[in-house]
Amino acid sequence: MGRAVSRGVVSLFSLFMAVVPAVPAHAAPSATSGAGYRFVKGGWIYVHLEGTPEQVGFQHGALLSSEIADMVSVIKLESAHATKRDWRFYRETARTMLWPHIDAEYQQELTGIAKGVQSKGIKLDVWDIVALNAGIELPQYYVPWLNKREKALNAPHILPEGRCSAFIATGSYTKGGKVVIAHNNWSSYAEGARWTIIFDVAPAKGHHILMDGEPGVITSQDDFGVNDAGLMITETTITQFEGWDPEGKPEFVRSRKALQYAGSINEYVAIIKDGNNGGYANDWLIGDRKTGEIAYLELGLKNTPLWRSKDGYFVSSNFARDPMVMKEDTPEFNPNNLAASENARRVTWESKMADEKGRIDVEMAEQFIADHEDSYSHKVEADERSLCGHVDKVKAGIPEWNWGPYYPGGAVTGKVADSEMAAKMALVAHAGHPCGDDFHAAEFLSAHPEYGYLRPILKDMPAGPWTAFRAGEK
């Protein structure tokens, strides 16, 4: 959630330090809580959660207590800097606007997370946990809508950040006709260095889930996962989206519910559209390993077009696709600006799909999301237009997301699966830049003191190896 440095950096830093909870040393690499457990592998923390919503939540909070407190610290600083609103505002919004629209099951799970964290001596409550879960949709979607509605004077210019490069393919485009799905998460490096949890969730009701995620968050959030009904999902954010429905259901609830309860593409689409609040508006790539069908749901607020195929592909890199979405949901988005990150990456994706038709598999997908091809400059260089993004290396930044020159953000993880792996509830994941480059925080801050406000939360982001995970792993 990067933003350019403002004159209020010092006061915001003071505000951050006043509200940040004490964060104890990280929990042991391996630990248990009831039926839940955790271990470290390949730069990821694998967390198994099992049982009722309360049990799943408590295990989550207890096993990741220090990581959750740390993640809250990140979202507090980033959101305060970007929106000029303090954590009290987000806690109160979580309580008064979001909570009444959260299903009872997930209210219980969120409460359980808070209790689990508290059991380890950390002073966070359920409103901190809900605000953390809404750490994208409140600052980047609700606050711009609220500022406009209230005609707020001197309101900061807030733009939803683009997140991710992804594709899904099937039929004649893939080796053996399998569904292949791949995704890399684009975020601030402060978030990305911590977005390294593999959640194996076996709920008392619904489907078993294997997904990546953030500490304390009940959904994948960058959204890559599989369930035991054969669904394979991912998404990328829609650039320059505008809109919010205060009576809608939070996106973090709808996306978790869809992966937990959907057994088909139709069911997934119905669940994630139900109560759509416009928060964290995404293009959803959905596959069904049972049928070989894939789908692309452009989930705007006013428009929600759906495309489907049993022999083809869908690529996504934060661009709006549908003309009505562009007209009514993303009126500032310019699809003809090929120098823009989202459009340049789309050109690269289309080229790769055409060039590699019939050969796409997991190994090739790993190479795709580690790629440094720049379709606009016609060079191979890690930058804001490469599928594996490195915005910290370029003066241009990404204006469409309000990422300034050399902003410390880009591709922070990679995940890939095919339908054969999904049948075994398995995936492969790469922590850090998928290309293998490490990010060194001290070196970056020395070169770019304008981002000194991030010093309390910016840390090294080492690139781990591609690592296989499966449900029930110990």
Predicted regions and their residues:
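Bacterial N-terminal signal peptides that target proteins for export
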Residues: 1-13
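Short stretches within intrinsically disordered, low-complexity N-terminal or propeptide regions
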Residues: 6, 20, 24-27
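Bacterial N-terminal signal peptides
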Residues: 10-22
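Intrinsic disorder/low-structure terminal segments
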Residues: 12-15, 313, 318, 332, ...
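N-terminal mature-domain region immediately after signal-peptide cleavage
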Residues: 26-266, 273-279, 285-308, 335-474
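A cross-kingdom feature marking charged/low-complexity
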Residues: 294-329
